[in-house]
């Protein structure tokens, strides 16, 4: 498939030869930790280990191997790599693992030519792989295939999103069309809504790109606010035209609602612009996008809709009797006008008392079970999980990085003994300084090993004790680094780093403390915890900005209406926020960043409803119809 830039299966004969030759030529420089430990104290332990290999019926030591490598350094390094690589081993050129039932599994590794989030390319690849799997099982019914990789999740997510959009999108569109037609007896209001929303979204996108040069994912999420709020502007004006179109001109209708629209826009934009104070690009982009987008939508209504709404059917208010009874009850029945807000306030307090916060990003996704099951099976077979948790050891040069890694290995062993991690993997490469130390150990231990072999009745051997240095660049360019290269990082300025993946992490905080114990060059990375902390920080900041925005709106209302009426006008907005959080808590959901983003939308829409109802030039009946229609449209569009 063209989607794959590289596919690695069996190692051919030439590659195997090159692989073996590299280890042979550099065996004195690739001494593994177990061999190093056996070489201590004169090398007696190494001598006994060599004899155990010779007399073992399963080791397969040949006379040629003993003559060429009497210290068995190459054998030791290969056994150490097999241990480090967990359950994978080389067999007939393949990386192979075996399950408890005795079945052999062969590893195929592919690298994408492009991004795993290129939806079209990934779907084509997954389709091709599924076809190949069917062909394989047709030819070999007993064959089994397991797959894992980001591409499988991204394709599943994109296809699921397309399905949701096609199903829910069609239902939403039909619902909005039916609602608009039922109320206005025309599709023109729907077209006018689309125009104002589209211009707002376009203006917001252009402004964001001009200022920031890119569009953050959070900005796209918040584009929903432009849909919800800008639709209110259009529907308020069109409702006024539908009810009073025979009595006044389009421009006179605009004059009745202009101040309310501008005040709603000013208040909402001020609330969003306060979020520019946040130090996070995502929230700042969101503020610019919403402020510019809503301004463009409102100005479209003010300057274009009076021209475009000519010929709009004029008809009485739908469900007029019901709305009039509601308005009358609200004015005359104190139990309703006081009791309902009090009841909602009590409901909000009761719900918010059960509120819990959860910034765990894993709770935001529903992983497909069939893909997750395959990933777990591969992890069990290989012993290598895909947890994005690792230490990063870095330095100004490759040798400094390797020296720091060697010192840090002791801490990793202690963490493993204490149960903080179940395992870790380090690249099988020694620093030049460590290679010199190993060569000294070899020279010291060689006489002991030679004597032990002679005492066992074997022919005299003569170990090659010359230096066989391995530099990082040579190792990276050799077949010996296959499967390890991705763990080594090199920057253009010469700085380098190496990843040390760990598994079975019990406490990310304790591992962070281990990294902090070193003066420099060691960093702990837990991608999930990092995102959890980032989302929590965003949530804290957004909560503060939301409260500041509410305070600014309150000050504006008090300055415009006085203390009493100003504070009363805030009651609907505060209750809407409180009830939203209460419903969230009572439904068993936790508060997270996206809950706060939804509250920003609720606040923006709630302010519109309050200002439309308080418009002195509008009639309560028209305002009630406009707000009801805007609410239903928003629920259909966002629900």
Please annotate each region the language model reported.
Residues 2-106, 419-483:
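Alpha-helical transmembrane helix bundles of large polytopic membrane transport and channel proteins
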Residues 210, 220, 226-242, 258, ...:
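Transmembrane alpha-helices and their membrane-interface boundaries in multi-pass membrane transporters
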Residues 335-457:
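Juxtamembrane segments of multi-pass membrane proteins
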């Amino acid at each position: 498939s063209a989607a794959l830039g590289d596919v690695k299966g069996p190692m051919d004969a030439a590659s195997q030869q090159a692989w073996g030759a590299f280890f042979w030529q550099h065996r004195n420089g690739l001494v593994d930790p177990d061999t190093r430990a056996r070489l201590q104290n004169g090398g007696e332990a190494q001598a006994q280990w060599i004899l155990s290999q010779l007399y073992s019926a399963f080791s397969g030591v040949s006379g040629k191997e003993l003559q060429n490598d009497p210290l068995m350094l190459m054998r030791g390094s290969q056994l150490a790599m097999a241990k480090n690589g967990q359950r994978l081993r080389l067999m007939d050129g393949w990386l192979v693992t075996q399950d408890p039932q005795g079945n052999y599994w062969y590893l195929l590794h592919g690298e994408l030519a492009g991004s795993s989030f290129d939806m079209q390319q990934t779907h084509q690849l997954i389709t091709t792989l599924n076809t190949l799997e069917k062909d394989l099982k047709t030819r070999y019914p007993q064959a089994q295939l397991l797959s894992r990789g980001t591409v499988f999740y991204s394709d599943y997510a994109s296809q699921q999103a397309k399905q949701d959009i096609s199903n829910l999108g069609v239902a939403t569109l039909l619902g909005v069309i039916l609602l608009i037609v039922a109320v206005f007896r025309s599709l023109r209001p729907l077209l006018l809504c689309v125009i104002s929303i589209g211009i707002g979204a376009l203006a917001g996108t252009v402004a964001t790109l001009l200022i920031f040069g890119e569009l953050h994912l959070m900005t796209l999420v918040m584009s929903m606010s432009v849909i919800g709020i800008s639709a209110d502007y259009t529907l308020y004006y069109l409702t006024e035209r539908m009810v009073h179109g025979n009595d006044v001109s389009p421009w006179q209708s605009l004059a009745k609602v202009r101040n309310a629209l501008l005040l709603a826009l000013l208040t909402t934009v001020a609330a969003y612009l306060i979020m520019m104070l946040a130090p996070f690009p995502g929230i700042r982009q969101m503020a610019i996008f919403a402020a510019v987008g809503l301004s463009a939508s409102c100005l479209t209504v003010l300057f274009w809709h009076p021209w475009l709404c000519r010929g709009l059917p004029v008809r009485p208010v739908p469900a007029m009797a019901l709305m009039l009874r509601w308005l009358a009850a609200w004015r005359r029945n104190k139990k309703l006008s006081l009791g309902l807000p009090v009841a909602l306030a009590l409901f909000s307090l009761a719900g918010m008392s059960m509120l819990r916060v959860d910034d765990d990003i894993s709770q935001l996704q529903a992983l497909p079970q069939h893909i997750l099951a395959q990933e777990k099976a591969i992890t069990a077979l290989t012993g290598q999980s895909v947890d994005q948790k690792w230490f990063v050891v870095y330095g100004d040069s490759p040798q400094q990085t390797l020296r720091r890694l060697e010192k840090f290995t002791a801490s990793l062993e202690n963490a493993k003994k204490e149960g903080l991690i179940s395992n870790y993997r380090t690249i099988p490469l020694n620093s030049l300084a460590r290679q010199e130390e190993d060569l000294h150990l070899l020279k010291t231990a060689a006489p002991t090993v030679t004597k032990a072999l002679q005492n066992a009745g074997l022919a005299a051997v003569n170990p090659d004790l010359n230096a066989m240095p391995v530099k990082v660049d040579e190792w990276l360019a050799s077949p010996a680094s296959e499967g390890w290269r991705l763990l080594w990082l090199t920057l253009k300025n010469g700085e380098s780093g190496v990843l040390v993946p760990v598994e079975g992490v019990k406490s990310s905080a304790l591992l962070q403390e281990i990294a902090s114990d070193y003066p420099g060059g060691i960093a702990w990375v837990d991608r999930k915890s990092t995102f959890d902390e980032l989302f929590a920080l965003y949530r804290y900041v957004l909560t503060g900005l939301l409260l500041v925005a509410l305070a600014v709106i309150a000050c504006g209302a008090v300055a415009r209406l006085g203390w009493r009426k100003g504070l009363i006008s805030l009651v609907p907005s505060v209750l809407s926020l409180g009830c939203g959080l209460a419903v969230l808590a009572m439904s068993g959901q936790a508060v997270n960043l996206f809950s706060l983003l939804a509250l920003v939308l609720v606040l923006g829409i709630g302010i519109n409803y309050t200002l439309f109802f308080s418009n002195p030039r509008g009639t309560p009946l028209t305002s009630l119809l406009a707000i009801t229609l805007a609410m239903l449209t928003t629920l259909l569009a966002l629900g």
